Amino acid sequence: FSSFFPGIAGLKGIPMWAFYVNRGQGICSFGIKNKNYSIMEFYPANVSYSVVNTFGFRTFLKIKKSNKTICYEPFLNNSADTENIKQTMKILPYELILEEINKNIGIKITVKYFTLPNQPVAGLMRSVTVENITNSDISVEVADGIPKILPYYMNTYAQKFMSTTIQAWATVDNFEKTGVPF
């Protein structure tokens, strides 16, 4: 299934839309106003089902336990071990929660999405929690994010039919001064 997450922003906030599917880490596109103001490229549901694991949010874990290193990407849905790996998705009016419990590795991963209410900017907030569910010590390194953020007002036409030209014109402002692109 697929749907739009409510863009709840409060009385003084700016609403943000987010499109999710029941695969991967859920969110496959989000932005403000409409799809011409996407932050993450909009795809219809039939395409989103197959690209969310590549173009959506991803989490990579490097887990060290008992002198053994395991590299793992949760929420991939490529395991036939449904007895030891459980995934759930909770959809609330103000929050989307994904949870994976992997008994083989001994971890529980929780991802929460929610909008930023009553603020002068729109925001899709994301929280990732990794919990050790064993009695053994583990060390975890995490890399998390999305593979591509669209420049402001890169409309749907430009995304679909002029992407190479638009990429050549995209710039990053203020990086030299602050070290933070915006």
Model regions and ranges:
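Anionic coordination/interaction segments
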Residues: F1-F182
